[in-house]
Amino acid sequence: MKSASLILFVALVALTYARSYEDVKEEIKNEVEKEILDDLEEENDELDDNTQEVNDPRARRWRRIVRRIRVRPLLPYIPCIIQAYQTGKK
């Protein structure tokens, strides 16, 4: 969604300030290529980070486990966890 909004905004700016249709096409093409290259670079950085984490002999196992936990999949279980925690208390 972010990329689509950015492309539409760039297209609007290009249409506003362009001298001809060819300028608009070239501007949009350049921005799309730039966005694609940025996304690929970010993905490559993420893959490099994961590789370093797995191959790092100094990394502790628990630290890696905690890093890999994502909050969003755990959200539905939070009320159950709280209820189970409060059940033992009186």
UniProtKB/Swiss-Prot annotation:
Membrane found in the keyword field: yes
Q: Which GO terms describe its cellular component?
A: extracellular region
Q: Would you say which domain of life the source belongs to?
A: Eukaryota
- Quote the protein name from its UniProt record: Arminin 45266
Family stated for the protein in its record = Belongs to the arminin family.
Signal sequence extent: 1-20
Residues folding into a coiled coil are: none
Carrying Threonine amide, the residues are 87
Propeptide at which positions? 21-59
Its keywords, alphabetically, are: Amidation, Antibiotic, Antimicrobial, Immunity, Innate immunity, Membrane, Secreted, Signal, Target cell membrane, Target membrane
What is the role of this chain?
Answer: Antimicrobial peptide with a broad-spectrum antimicrobial activity. Keeps its antibacterial activity under a wide range of salt concentrations that mimic physiological conditions of human blood, which is surprising, since Hydra is an obligate freshwater animal with nearly no salt tolerance. Does not affect red blood cells.
- UniProt note on tissues of expression: Expressed in entodermal epithelium along the body column.
Localized where?
A: Secreted; Target cell membrane
